[in-house]
Each structure stands twice: as C-alpha cells, then as structure tokens.
Swiss-Prot record:
Superkingdom, natural source: Eukaryota
Source organism of the structure: Debaryomyces hansenii (strain ATCC 36239 / CBS 767 / BCRC 21394 / JCM 1990 / NBRC 0083 / IGC 2968)
Any one of the GO BP annotations: GPI anchor biosynthetic process
Cellular component aspect of the GO annotation: endoplasmic reticulum membrane
Recorded name of the encoding gene: GPI11
Localisation: Endoplasmic reticulum membrane
Its membrane topology: Multi-pass membrane protein
Protein name: Glycosylphosphatidylinositol anchor biosynthesis protein 11
Associated pathway: Glycolipid biosynthesis; glycosylphosphatidylinositol-anchor biosynthesis
Chain's role: Acts in the GPI biosynthetic pathway between GlcNAc-PI synthesis and GPI transfer to protein.
Main location: endoplasmic reticulum
Glycosylation sites: N99
C-alpha cells in the first residue's frame, strides 16, 4: 500500500496585500483630493489675534455687541486667509485650467455666503445640543456664525464647494493621518473640539464674567483653530 501524501498547505501573504492597499490609499489621498502646502502663511494667526481683540474691546461686558462687531472683522480676515489657501493649494498649482485663477474672487465671496447659510443649521444643532432656548438666542446665533466662518469657510475654499470630494476624502482609508497633515482640516477639527471643551467651565461655581454664555465656547473655537494650524506646521 503506497504511503499517503501529505496535503500541501497554501499560504497567502496578507501583509503584502495590506501594504499594497495602504500604498494605494495614500496615493488616492495625495492625488485625488486637494492638499495644502504646510506653511506659516496658512497658520490662522488671525484667530488668536481676533479673540484677543474681542476680549480687549469688552466681550465680557457686551457679549452681543462685541460678537457682532467681531463678525465684521472676521469676514475680511477670512477672505484674505481664503486667498492664501488658494495660493498654497497643491492641486490648484497642478491644474492647467486658466479659469480657476480667474474665479478666485467668486470662490472666496461665495464661500462666505455659503458659510452664513450653513450657520442656520449649525444654530439649530447648538440648540439641540443644549444651548439656552429661553434666553441668549441672539448670542447663540452669533456664535453659530463665528463657528461657521471658522470651521466651514476654509474647507469650502480648499475643496471649491465639492461636497462629494470631501465625503469621499472622509471615507477613505488613512483619513485621520491625512487630516493631521492638513492645516486647514486640522484647524477645523480642533475648532470643533475647542468649542466642545468650552462648555466645561460654564457650570463651574467660579462666578467669573468670562463664564457667561457663549464666551467660553467662542474662545475654545478660536484657540482650537489657531492651535490646529500651528501644530500641523510644527509637527509636520
């Protein structure tokens, strides 16, 4: 009786496939989506300067009035910041279309309009998440405008209103690492986180003027925006 032959086991190198998939994902993130060159020009220094100015001009004494004036200061600063974003966008530099450069003013102005429109659903979200409903509605809405201009506007300029491209980017593998290397997106994420942390001091029994709604949330958003931009630059 002939001896039984041992069945040979086939093995597949999943490590190789994994590395190939990761490399493909990194290639897609680098080529299909807008990127920004890390630079001191795209650090949102104006975020730190503006929140300092708001306190300097009496934010704790006249919350509504100073926040309203702050919006009229923030809009031109964001327009300038948006222009700097277009000059540092790597995809913009690689494209050969001449129309893109001609439409920069329209892109920047349209981004402001869209951000102001997006402040309405953001205002509703703030109410649903616990913002005072019986009082401070005007202050909450001004907060939503500040947040929308800080968080949405730079991304709108970078992605040129391409919602589908942004969704595909957020759904791609390695997106967290890509966000950490993108000054615009990291600033937006840390602005959101800063706003969330800004809620913490409000109920504390310290009896300070700066604990009034929504000063700490506004402060957290501006600081988060600045920290995101400078952290990406320093740790790139």
């Amino acid at each position: 009786m002939p001896p039984k032959l041992k069945a040979t086991r086939k093995s597949v190198s999943f490590q190789h496939l994994s590395d190939e998939d990761i490399s493909k994902s990194q290639y897609i993130l680098k080529t299909e989506f807008p990127r920004i060159e890390t630079s001191t020009l795209t650090i949102p220094f104006h975020s730190a300067l503006l929140i300092f100015g708001l306190y300097k001009f009496g934010l704790t004494n006249d919350i509504y009035g100073v926040m309203l004036k702050g919006i009229f200061s923030l809009i031109p600063l964001q327009l300038l910041y948006g222009y700097l974003i277009t000059t540092r966008s790597e995809k913009e530099k690689k494209t050969k279309s001449h129309n893109n450069s001609e439409n920069v003013p329209l892109l920047l102005a349209g981004g402001i309009v869209i951000s102001l429109v997006l402040s309405v659903p953001l205002f509703v979200a703030l109410i649903l998440l616990g913002a005072p409903l019986a009082s401070h509605l005007k202050e909450t809405y001004l907060l939503s405008i500040h947040l929308s201009l800080l968080i949405f506007y730079p991304s709108l300029v970078l992605y040129k209103y391409d919602y589908k491209s942004l969704v595909k980017f957020l759904d791609a593998d390695g997106v967290y690492n890509a966000i950490a290397k993108n000054q615009i997106l990291l600033s937006a994420v840390l602005a959101v986180i800063g706003t969330w942390f800004g809620v913490i001091p409000i109920p504390l029994d310290w009896d300070r003027d700066w604990q009034q709604w929504p000063i700490t949330l506004l402060t957290g958003a501006y600081i988060g925006s600045f920290v995101g931009g400078i952290a990406c630059f320093l740790f790139q």
